[in-house]
Amino acid sequence: MATRTQARGAVVELLYAFESGNEEIKKIASSMLEEKKIKNNQLAFALSLFNGVLEKINEIDALIEPHLKDWDFKRLGSMEKAILRLGAYEIGFTPTQNPIIINECIELGKLYAEPNTPKFLNAILDSLSKKLAQKPLN
């Protein structure tokens, strides 16, 4: 049985495919997750994250951008965008504790991105979580 960490990793892969121009990924997300042995509760969890990010993608991007400092969101790599979007969605729109979300995103960065990406993800998501703690979205 898959873990939430594995489910998040699969969601990042789906978001990466979407960011890379594969809009058909929305139609086959469920079967792709099942191929990765993401089933039952974890399948529902992964699909809720994937669909949640896509439904709120513009709002999520607007949440992330002010925390980039010297970076332009459009110039970020597709994998970095995928991980940041997942993290920002979970921080802003789910009850999962922020330290858990940030740690999971750091681990995903180590697995999928460039060596300096985990520090970058940590800085952005930590800044975002502190901002939302002061002024929640709901």
UniProtKB/Swiss-Prot annotation:
GO cellular component, one term: cytosol
Top-rank lineage group of the source organism: Bacteria
Keyword Secreted among record annotations: no
InterPro entries reported for this sequence: NusB-like_sf, NusB_fam, NusB_RsmB_TIM44
Name of the featured protein: Transcription antitermination protein NusB
Functional note: Involved in transcription antitermination. Required for transcription of ribosomal RNA (rRNA) genes. Binds specifically to the boxA antiterminator sequence of the ribosomal RNA (rrn) operons.
GO BP terms: DNA-templated transcription termination; transcription antitermination
The keyword tRNA processing is annotated on this UniProt entry: no
Gene3D superfamilies: NusB-like
Keywords: RNA-binding, Transcription, Transcription antitermination, Transcription regulation
GO terms for MF: RNA binding
